[in-house]
Amino acid sequence: MVHKPVLLNEVVEALSPKDGSVYVDATFGGGGYSRRILETAQCVVYAIDQDVVVKKYFDELLQSFPGRLNLAISRFSKLREVVLSFGVDKVDGVVFDLGTSAMQLADASRGFSFMNSGSLDMRMCSSALRDAAMFVNTVPEKEMADVIYQYGGERYSRRVARAIIDARRKCRINNTGDLATIIRSAVPRSRVHPIDPATRTFQAIRIWVNNELEELQAGLETAAEVLKIGGKILVTSFHSLEDRVVKHKFRSLCDMGFSLINKKAIMPTDEEVKNNPRSRSGKLRAIARVE
């Protein structure tokens, strides 16, 4: 399954790639953002992704843009080191497309989705020390409930944590299918919001496993450090926690020589939502360095 980048037209319009410029695609994934940027101008893109699986998509895209595309398998928090490793000090723009890709969700062995039972993994980086199995089988009940509430917004977080603890006392929880069943037993289905009861808890576990909010904060800080005057940072987020981090960081940057490109987040059009339902929750925020 190929990942469809959300708000792609809006991102490229706001970024406005120029010939001779240098950009960072901080979430390469399937290469959707990188491809459009490279098609728009005779520029160079330095791509970053912590998932080694993306090398396949990078190799394919590199054939179309030899000498203009580079990849580093790394994290947001290492963005500055990555840029310097390519012999560059400052760049003209950095783009982030947050969350999981369609390829990650479609691969049951990665454990990101409960649609098909698979390993309790959820690691964006295969060398990371903690995974979803560690969370559900070792984390204490109170900490588990707090994570599920804070990162997933799950109002029944304590019931979910209790159900997981009770289940793991009987036997180790080994796959996403079993975990989803346990969660569903603790969360009543809503008639108003008919999403799967496991959705919020799976999101919370994924954020915990990958330290996502801290990585995002660090990524935004380092992106600001490597930006030229006139350069831009663009972030597409998919849930309120991500958007809050972006909004607060951008607000603080406005006191440090930056200016918001759009005062309000840009949302996908009705047509995009129709063609790509995943885009429904997407929000694009953009900021430029002016001094």
Curated annotation (Swiss-Prot):
InterPro entries, per the entry: RsmH, SAM-dep_MeTrfase_MraW_recog, SAM-dependent_MTases_sf
Task: Give the source's domain of life in one word.
Answer: Bacteria
What's its catalytic activity?
cytidine(1402) in 16S rRNA + S-adenosyl-L-methionine = N(4)-methylcytidine(1402) in 16S rRNA + S-adenosyl-L-homocysteine + H(+)
Q: Name one GO molecular function term.
A: rRNA (cytosine-N4-)-methyltransferase activity
Q: What is its main location?
A: cytoplasm
Q: Where in the cell is it found?
A: Cytoplasm
What Pfam families does this protein's entry cite? Methyltransf_5
The answer to whether UniProt assigns keyword rRNA processing to this entry is: yes
Keyword Disulfide bond in annotation: no
PANTHER family for the chain: 12S RRNA N4-METHYLCYTIDINE METHYLTRANSFERASE, S-ADENOSYL-METHYLTRANSFERASE MRAW
Biological function? Specifically methylates the N4 position of cytidine in position 1402 (C1402) of 16S rRNA.
Protein name, per record: Ribosomal RNA small subunit methyltransferase H
